[in-house]
């Protein structure tokens, strides 16, 4: 048994963990105070003994928050996050496909003019992805009210609805 701590920013908060199909664990976390001071999405991989294999931060130029991620296959993962612009009070869902080495395969953003956020993502049987979250950019004209938001993508992260 073991206990470890990891960090790349001033404050790091673990948010999700998956067992890697190649052994060890993948951890997604929120990073505060890294780079230009914005919040970023952190991802790290450790072995079964808790030794760090690699650690990366994504985002950096805009505030981001990690939400959830899922295993796609033995060496790929899908993560849903939010990109937040506090000056315009808006946000977009941010979908990132990552390989086992923490390299981004592709990334897509979804949303319009208001607050759109993805909270959960799973792979679908047709090799695409489905995201659920919240939106006040759709039919709703009240910026203080949100609708349940569901978005389906193809295997490359494209959606005909956004």
Q: What are the residue ranges of the model-derived segments?
A:
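A sequence-level/structural motif corresponding to short, flexible coil/turn segments enriched
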Residues: 1-162
């Amino acid at each position: 048994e073991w206990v470890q701590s990891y960090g790349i920013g001033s404050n790091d908060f673990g948010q999700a963990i998956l067992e890697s199909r190649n052994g060890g664990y993948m951890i997604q976390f929120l990073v505060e105070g890294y780079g230009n001071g914005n919040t970023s999405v952190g991802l790290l991989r450790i072995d079964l003994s808790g030794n760090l294999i690699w650690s990366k931060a994504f985002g950096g130029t805009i505030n981001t928050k990690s939400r959830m991620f899922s295993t796609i296959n033995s060496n790929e993962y899908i993560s849903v996050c939010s990109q937040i612009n506090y000056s315009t009070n808006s946000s977009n869902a941010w979908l990132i496909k990552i390989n086992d080495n923490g390299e981004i395969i592709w990334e897509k953003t979804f949303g319009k003019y208001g607050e759109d956020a993805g909270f959960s993502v799973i792979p679908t049987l047709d090799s695409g992805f489905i995201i659920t979250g919240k939106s006040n950019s759709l039919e709703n004209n009240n910026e203080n009210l949100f609708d349940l938001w569901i978005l389906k993508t193809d295997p490359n992260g494209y959606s005909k609805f956004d």
